[in-house]
Amino acid sequence: MSKDGNLNTSEFDPLANKEYTEEQKQTLEQEQKEFLSQTTTPELEADDGFIVTSASSAQSTPSTSALSGNISPDSQTSDPITKAVRETIIQPQKDNLIEQILKDLAALTDHDLAEQKRKEIEEEKDKDKTLSTFFGNPANREFIDKALENPELKKKLESIEIAGYKNVHNTFSAASGYPGGFKPVQWENHVSASDLRATVVKNDAGDELCTLNETTVKTKPFTLAKQDGTQVQISSYREIDFPIKLDKADGSMHLSMVALKADGTKPSKDKAVYFTAHYEEGPNGKPQLKEISSPKPLKFAGTGDDAIAYIEHGGEIYTLAVTRGKYKEMMKEVELNQGQSVDLSQAEDIIIGQGQSKEQPLITPQQTTSSSVEPPQYKQQVPPITPTNQPLQPETSQMPQSQQVNPNLLNAATALSGSMQDLLNYVNAGLTKEIDLIKEAATAILNDKKSDIAEKQANIIALAENTVNNKNLTPDAKVAGVNAVLETIKNDQNTPDLEKSKMLEATVAIALNSENLEPKQKQQILEKAVDVGLSLKDDASRAAAIDGITDAVIKSNLSTEDKGTMFIAVGDKVNVSELSNAEKQKLLGSVLKKGVEAQVLSPAQQQLMQQNLDKITAEQTKKDTIKKVNDILFDPLSNTELKTTNIQAIISNVLDGPATAEVKGEIIQEITNTVAGSSLEAHDKAAIIKGISETIATHSDTSLSLPNKALIMASAEKGIAESQANLPDRELMTKGLVDGIYEGKGGPEITKAVSSGIDNSNINDSEKEALKKAKDAASEAALDRETQNLTEGLKGQNIEEHKPHDDIYNKVREVINAVNPVIEALEKSKEPVVSAEERIVQETSSILNNISKLAVEKVNNFRAMLSPNGNLKTLEEKKEESIKKVDELVKAFGTKSSTEEQQSFIKANLIDDKTLSKEIRLQTIDKLLQEQKRAEAIENPSVKTEDVRVVSGKSKLKPISKDKPDIEKAKMVVGRDRVNIKGNIKIMRALMNARDSIQSENLNKSTPIKRESSPPQR
């Protein structure tokens, strides 16, 4: 190995010992310098990767064809994205490869063999255009290898790959309107480590499919050889933990991760190639790994399971986010699920990879997955510096085969390589033996039937302590040893879980207080203990384990900063665990509370942990809310009106909740999306959406500000826009949303928010335009309705004519009458406290201020009166109401038997009650006066009115007295109390005074004008 840590290939690489002229050496050195100096960043950098998900079984039918690379028959249509990858990338590559093979066969000197192979290709192509049998036949290996040596073909295959992935990603992107389509990965950094990122993948129903974890590996530089012989240094790459089994939610998933350049950065978009895992919906609805698509040919930088995959593309080296071990796992799962085989860049690419030895065993689709990983051609094996708790792995560099190699040099290099491998195996065996001994000791302790729980705990603690304090072990080996103890505790079937939690706490305490471990190594042990604690069977044991571990952190001799880091590590482990949101919420809340109380968390750490807790809480709330909404929507016994009312109640609870406006918006977006995607009729869904919108618009401004209402309304529209409903239904629901805003008297800011929701939705531009037109049409219709209602309300009204009894005129008079007392009071003030000039200015300002306030109040009243819900009515309506009210008052007056009761009635109902209009009160007085005059006419026949005569003449009663027959008849007509002449005089006086008082109200409200009236002539 060279001093700088790179592999010294001259010892092991036969080609490195080839003699070059001085000119050739200078040329090679210059090419290497030029390559290493290429640091210009592309203008358009490729995305990290893309994710596409679906919860619809209609979009994904599991393929049942064998692991052969065949495209499924029409009757077995596979996932459309998987099919598109085959048709736009894999099949065109195969077609070009076959074309080159046929050209090579035509130039073959053995014409019989050439004709035989040509017929074999043509006959199979008629049956199976993928030619899987041809590519799987070992006898065809040399023809495939030779074709791939053609540089023009290599360029074609690379261009097909780049263009194909770009086309697939664009066609099936969410931005293009494909439901649940490809969208860039949104990674979130772990708080505890900057080299760890994660993202939660959900199906289009919002259910979690899996959590992807990405690790950026900073490694000691190692070299990889390109096909032209130049070498490239690799010091950074990433690994993604692609899931093997998915059992959380239904649907399909495609993970397409961009290959990184040799320096660990992303390539430009025009050079981007991807490693894609296709998970199609299985028979049970859960995603199954059915196929892997990757660039060709796929190689690995070593023989160990942790060796990273890489490719050479366009003359450059790119690393893929998958290791040899992970690739083997994935291929085994593909075979298990009987999915489509990998394309040219997998099983078949491995067969035809350039530079492979002819003696290597052929990898066919029917072989086991472990053999489907291409072994490297030349292994340069030296003991690299790696953590001693992991087996040491040789670094591998694949070199081109096209040059002639000296057999003696090759044999010498191979022998030396074998010796180095033996040395590595010996070192690894020693380390493995130490860890195995620790495991055996832990197992023996826990299985000792003679020991009780306390003794077992003491012995486990002693074992962990001895491991940490063993000076013969490296720090990494100590970590591996303690973790082996923890793993043994986890797997033990005899120890109760609560007792296991105590062992975890004690083991963590030993590690944290050790002076032989660095903080990073202590954290590794703590994280392993948390993993074991979270794997316990019941929630009480899990809670006890986490509580004990955090107690150990607080009691340790770590610095406050390191304690905070440990708490964050515990929180991160809880956050990414497979536990339910409810349990995560409880555990994370407990960790946060304890960290705050112990004052080990910085404000930034508290905020980050609180954000994670809020996300979990919001997710749980969202899940519970959507379940309630679905229960309402699918209730067969409730009609649309009842469904709307019940969902409105849920909306109100969400708006009143403690969550942020953003979280409330997310929940309501899920609700509208659920409603829009339901199986109800379009008009029923629109009615429910209208109710939701009205509830948001009318919600109290004190608990929900106007900007937050607008934010939530935009989210509501986004839920509609991104739903699976067809476009006409979404247009109708958008109109319903706007109608609800107008019904709820929402302002223009809320209406504009609907457009914002459309703009921010993940749909194509034509759909956005259609929804905006629907929104504008609904707004115009609502304004037309308001205008029409105002017009109807003003029919028959002449607002400009100032009649004494007109409502508008009276409102203006009220303003004047209210201002007059203010002016009079100021004029009477004779105690100036300032100079005359200042007093005039102050008084004038005060008067104007009062006038302004009163004017604003009255104008608002005037506006309210003119609104569709105001009190402005037509003359006919007002007349009918007045007559009805007058009759009610006269009837009520008639129930009063004594003069005192009648006078009290007049004062209370006709003078003091200002809620009645002047017109009604005056008409009532006029009618009562007429009644009194009829009674008077009975006593004085000379003033008897025609009305009374007519009424009296219709009476069929006989006179009681011959002297005064009319009196008796009149008693029957007007009632016995109304013939009391003295009482009549008092009542008539009271009525006339009341009339004068009412008429003078506009002139002086506080002082009614009394009028002296003499009794009428008798």
UniProtKB/Swiss-Prot annotation:
<feature type="compositionally biased region" description="Basic and acidic residues">
    <location>
        <begin position="1009"/>
        <end position="1018"/>
    </location>
</feature>
<feature type="compositionally biased region" description="Polar residues">
    <location>
        <begin position="1"/>
        <end position="11"/>
    </location>
</feature>
<dbReference type="Pfam" id="PF12574">
    <property type="entry name" value="120_Rick_ant"/>
</dbReference>
<feature type="region of interest" description="Disordered">
    <location>
        <begin position="355"/>
        <end position="402"/>
    </location>
</feature>
<feature type="compositionally biased region" description="Polar residues">
    <location>
        <begin position="387"/>
        <end position="402"/>
    </location>
</feature>
<feature type="region of interest" description="Disordered">
    <location>
        <begin position="995"/>
        <end position="1018"/>
    </location>
</feature>
<feature type="compositionally biased region" description="Polar residues">
    <location>
        <begin position="69"/>
        <end position="80"/>
    </location>
</feature>
<keyword id="KW-0963">Cytoplasm</keyword>
<feature type="compositionally biased region" description="Polar residues">
    <location>
        <begin position="355"/>
        <end position="380"/>
    </location>
</feature>
<protein>
    <recommendedName>
        <fullName>Antigenic heat-stable 120 kDa protein</fullName>
    </recommendedName>
</protein>
<feature type="compositionally biased region" description="Basic and acidic residues">
    <location>
        <begin position="19"/>
        <end position="34"/>
    </location>
</feature>
<feature type="compositionally biased region" description="Low complexity">
    <location>
        <begin position="53"/>
        <end position="68"/>
    </location>
</feature>
<feature type="region of interest" description="Disordered">
    <location>
        <begin position="1"/>
        <end position="82"/>
    </location>
</feature>
<dbReference type="GO" id="GO:0005737">
    <property type="term" value="C:cytoplasm"/>
</dbReference>
<feature type="compositionally biased region" description="Polar residues">
    <location>
        <begin position="996"/>
        <end position="1007"/>
    </location>
</feature>
<dbReference type="InterPro" id="IPR020954">
    <property type="entry name" value="Rickettsia_antigen_120kDa"/>
</dbReference>
